[in-house]
Amino acid sequence: MGALREDAKYIYTRAIEAVLPDEAVRRALDGADFPGRVILVAAGKAAWRMASAAVSALGERIDTGIVITKYGHAQGTIPGIVCREAGHPVPDENSFSAAREALALTENLTADDTVLFLLSGGGSALFESPLVPGVELQDITAQLLACGADIVEINTIRKRLSAVKGGRFARHCAPAHVFAVILSDIVGDPVDMIASGPVSPDSSTCADALAAAEKYALRLSDTARGLLAQETPKTADNVTVRVTGSVRELCAAAAKACRDLGYTPEILTDCEQGVAREVGARLGALARENASCGTPRAFILGGETVVRLTGNGKGGRNQELALAAAAEIAGAENIVVFSVGSDGTDGPTDAAGGLADGGTVERLAAAGKTVADVLPNNDAYHALRDTGDLIITGPTGTNVNDFAAALVR
């Protein structure tokens, strides 16, 4: 199983390297014409790396700027750019203060000026100017993360509680031109949902927001409920958008890495949005069914699963997926299943995801635990830590969803 685990590491490392935003940002900026001042605003988990690439490409054409990213994701200083770190997945005071700085930088611009807006996943929490008290927004965010809502439902509500989401940041920047380079972390690349669409016309409606609030029985103040009933901007005439990077590229890179190692890869889907533990069980069962096929196989899926919080443990969707798969492949000597977040973080943990092999369940039992006990408590992190199956990469500098693979030798 050691060789299989090394194969897994090679595959997820190469896949993530293939979707780092550096070259993609440079391509997006190639040939772009910025006649006046250029103000850089980068928000999201990949913001630092995207901004660094932009400064490398444009140099002194950038007058000033700000990077807003997650704690631990800034990788040093960038000449002429202020770097701020803030809270994720729940916004904190640093999220609010950094947004105020960005709003100040982009006030009173002219039609000749350009806001170079570099956006990636995580921006919903990191770049925030709430229309309700900050503590109330934090509570609503926590409810949304715990209730099992998908990312579109979550961001449909977030947009209406913010002065910078749902196209409102684009309005703030007007009459300046906003040139947006967006790294997609949502299945299907809906630009108005990525980081809650600060510069994109909103395709959702107030009816959608109110329906989601009712569906999940959210506790809302009268002020918040009133904001959900208000429409967001439906046009953004001062914006040019270039989407770069996606989970499709991540899965394709994973498939190439599998072929490098002699596996025959099959991409099952690049738009997985099911419940993490159910997806993990299916992936593990599929690997088990093919355990005696005689040729190395790799089954790959990408997307963003959801976690239903039923306990008070620690973990993330990728860790839950891997642990659920462990129960299906217990005892198998020729199977490994892993699941990772391309940004290097999975839930409120220091792990990127998790891995399971045929011995994971046995090692878990030696720690006095079972998969059946751990998953309802959402405590996959501690379980995989006990079995030595956490995947820890550190912040990667990109963010294009998650991917998982089952390897069969």
Descriptions of predicted regions:
Residues 1-41, 49-50:
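An N-terminal, well-structured beta->alpha segment
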Residues 41-43, 66-69, 116-121, 180-186, ...:
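Short beta-strand segments
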Residues 53-62, 80-83, 103, 107, ...:
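A glycine- and small-aliphatic-rich helix-loop capping segment at beta-alpha/alpha-beta transitions
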Residues 133-219:
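Internal gly/pro-rich beta-alpha loop/helix module
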Residues 158, 179, 201-282, 286:
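Accessory alpha-helical/coil subdomains and C-terminal extensions
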Residues 262-339, 347-348:
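Active-site segments that bind and position negatively charged phosphate/pyrophosphate groups
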Residues 323-409:
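Internal helix-turn-beta structural module
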